[in-house]
């Protein structure tokens, strides 16, 4: 009887080992089909031109949340870029909620972490396209080169904003394929400017990137050489390279862009109307979305209770910013012409 029990135990033990071995062999890397059925996997995007084009559009899509928010006015990632400069203030009742306007924001503030995340989303997506779109079998070389140029512009746009704020950030110029290459140290401000200029120079030298899209073109709103010249000119201004900036801005005009003057004396006002959002003065603009609940960020923060639901105009143009404009006759702006005694008023007044 004891011998039978021992034999039985050995059989059970052997069967368990065999079952475990079978389980381990059956759980190999190719045992489960991990390809999602409800969306496109990353490995499939570069197999068709239609999918690759959606990846390019996905880079542009980062603009949607930045410029066309559909909820909230205090979310830090929806605060206009103006808030991080000297051109905007906020009213006294909300000053504690707007540390970005008072210089009281800290490095740990969500105001900055949200911007950091958004622009690195730009960079991550752009790098993915730049590194991989060359694999697409049914896309022409010209289409691939144009897409790469567009994504280099968008990458440069993101790095420019980051470099203005942080004066040096980690520089990623290739897609992140593993955790090991996703933990770079901070690059110097000069190195980031150099990378930005190289991207924009590649754009203006790309023969497959058009100088300008005309109004009504199905590609209107996409990156052009004119936009690349304009952005590179801004970079040169940040570097105080004035002559290079002037040359680039002249090149913008050479691409077919120019001031909107068709409305005569009211041209500047009419420029900001929907009817003229594709006029010759618009170099690179986010188009209006005619969809309920969406609104331009400035409509929300500078508007009234009628814009985007029930929004408030707690952001106010800084008086010094207003003073930087000339009058219609070319004279220097003077508050006393509009508010007599303004220049002699005390701060509390």
Mark where each language-model region is.
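Short, compositionally biased low-complexity segments
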Residues: 26-35, 95-99, 169-170
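An aromatic- and glycine-enriched ligand-binding surface/loop that stacks and positions planar moieties
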Residues: 28-92, 193, 201, 207, ...
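Secondary-structure transition into beta-strands, especially the periplasmic turns and strand N-termini
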Residues: 4, 24-26, 137-152, 239-251
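Sec-dependent bacterial lipoprotein signal peptides
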Residues: 2-25
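Glycine- and aromatic-rich loop/turn segments at beta-sheet edges
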Residues: 168-175, 205-217, 259-266
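Conserved, well-structured interaction surfaces
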Residues: 48-68, 89-166, 181-183, 187-194, ...
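Short coil/turn linking the two alpha-helices of tandem helical-hairpin repeats
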Residues: 163-164, 170, 238-241
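Short linear capping/connector segments at secondary-structure termini
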Residues: 37-41, 104-105, 173-181, 214-217
């Amino acid at each position: 009887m004891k011998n039978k029990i021992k034999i039985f135990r050995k059989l059970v033990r052997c069967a368990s080992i065999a079952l475990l071995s079978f389980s381990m062999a059956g759980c190999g890397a190719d045992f489960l089909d991990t390809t999602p059925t409800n969306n496109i996997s990353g490995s499939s995007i570069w197999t068709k031109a239609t999918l690759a084009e959606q990846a390019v559009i996905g880079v542009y899509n980062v603009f949607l949340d930045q410029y066309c928010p559909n909820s909230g006015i205090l979310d830090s990632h929806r605060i206009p870029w103006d808030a991080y400069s000297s051109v905007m203030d906020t009213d006294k009742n909300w000053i504690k909620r707007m540390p970005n306007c008072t210089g009281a924001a800290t490095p740990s503030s969500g105001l900055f972490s949200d911007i950091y995340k958004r622009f690195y989303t730009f960079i991550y997506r752009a790098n993915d396209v730049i590194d991989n779109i060359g694999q697409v079998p049914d896309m022409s070389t010209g289409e691939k080169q144009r897409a790469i140029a567009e994504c280099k512009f968008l990458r440069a746009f993101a790095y420019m904003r980051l470099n203005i704020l942080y004066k040096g950030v980690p520089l990623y110029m290739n897609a992140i394929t593993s955790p090991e290459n996703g933990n770079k140290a901070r690059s110097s401000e000069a190195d980031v400017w150099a990378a930005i200029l190289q991207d924009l120079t590649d754009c203006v030298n790309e023969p497959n990137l058009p100088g300008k899209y005309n109004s009504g073109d199905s590609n209107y709103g996409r990156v052009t050489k004119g936009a690349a010249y304009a952005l590179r000119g801004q970079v040169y201004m940040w570097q105080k390279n004035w002559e290079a900036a002037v040359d680039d801005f002249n090149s913008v005009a050479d691409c077919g862009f120019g001031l909107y003057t068709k409305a005569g004396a009211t041209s500047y006002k009419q420029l900001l109307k929907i009817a003229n959002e594709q006029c010759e003065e618009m170099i690179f603009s986010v188009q209006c979305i005619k969809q309920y609940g969406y609104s331009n960020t400035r409509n929300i923060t500078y508007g009234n209770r009628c814009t985007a639901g029930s929004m408030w105009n707690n952001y106010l143009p800084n008086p010094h910013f207003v003073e930087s404009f000339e009058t219609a006759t070319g004279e220097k702006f003077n508050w006393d012409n509009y508010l007599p005694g303004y220049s002699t008023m005390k701060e509390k007044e």
